[in-house]
Amino acid sequence: MLKTLSVTSLSMALAAVFAASGTATSTAEAATKYCDGPKVTWKISLFGKRRAVTEGVEYISQYAKDQTCDKFDYKIYYGEQLSKAKENLDGIKVGALEGGYVCASYHPGKLRALGVLDLPFLPIYDFDVMTKVYDTLWARKELIDSLGRWGARRHLQTILPRYEYMGRGKPPKSLEDFKGMRMRALGGMGDAAKAIGAVPTTMPAPETYTALQRGTVDAVGFPFSYTFAAYKLDEISTWYTTNMSAGMVNCVTAISQPAWEKLPKQYQAILDEALPGAYKAMIDAYGAEDKINLPKWEKSGKLTAVSFSEEELVKFQKVGGKPVWEKWVEETKPEVPTAQALLDLVLKTANEANKSKSAKK
């Protein structure tokens, strides 16, 4: 039976992960203030507007101000004010930004190793398994070096709900109905869409409303459900899927390595202390958005919820899962010789985590 990601499971998982890793801080430690430090301003570039996924970054920004008596200004810029969505990585490299939102699928030629976490239909069915996979993979030199080549390092991992699709026109009733459909589908999910006859395209999230409105695309893939509302796609769409769970997208808040090294040690500690609260802020925001969006969509009568049968989903996984994984390995090996090892590690970590969870039930 296919499973969906649970906000509650993520909350529990993150608590366990941080406790085990030593990242979690005690109340006394978290309350430590460093009011005698220097004034520092960091420019953090985010695309789109403030929404559920950015609540984690907002938390870090506020925490930094509170713990330094406003000396450390971790300043967030929305709406591509500082940099286009696909240019944040370049901005970090040249020193124009101290940090920004970076998605591997926006930079496939630059972050090859990170693409393994964008593959469709990986056996990652809930948030705690996702956290274990991210934690394990980001310990690998290949992933660290992928960002390191651009003078960047990962700070906050973006934990996203699985992807669904929202579109205009006649609601699809089977996978056959996706043939010829123009879809915004990123990374490996784009290859999976192609496998069922769709025409995938990659575009930054801020461009999706106009593309759907003008008919450049027929459907848009996004993390369910907050993103559809954040970019107002629910205002111009006629249907959305509920159980495709096509995959996830590997996005992080990347920060400048040189800027990090120049940061006073107490400010570095503050950024690390903020992480558990930042993850909780994201989780809480996802849950709150679902409670608003789903009843609103149902009540509007304008949006048809599309659920596919188990048989249809198994068919989708068969053509859009393992074949896409194998294709990614072959295309990535010239630049990342350990591509197969990375995929094997993802599968091993996820399967062991799933098995461990089942044994505890």
Model feature map: region roles:
Residues 8-9, 133-136, 164:
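Proteins with a high burden of low-complexity, intrinsically disordered sequence enriched in S/T/G/P/A and R
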Residues 29-129, 145-361:
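N-terminal secretory/targeting leader peptides
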Residues 12-27:
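C-terminal segment of classical bacterial N-terminal signal peptides
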Residues 129-145:
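Signature of the catalytic double-stranded beta-helix
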Residues 1-12:
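Bacterial N-terminal signal peptides that target proteins for export
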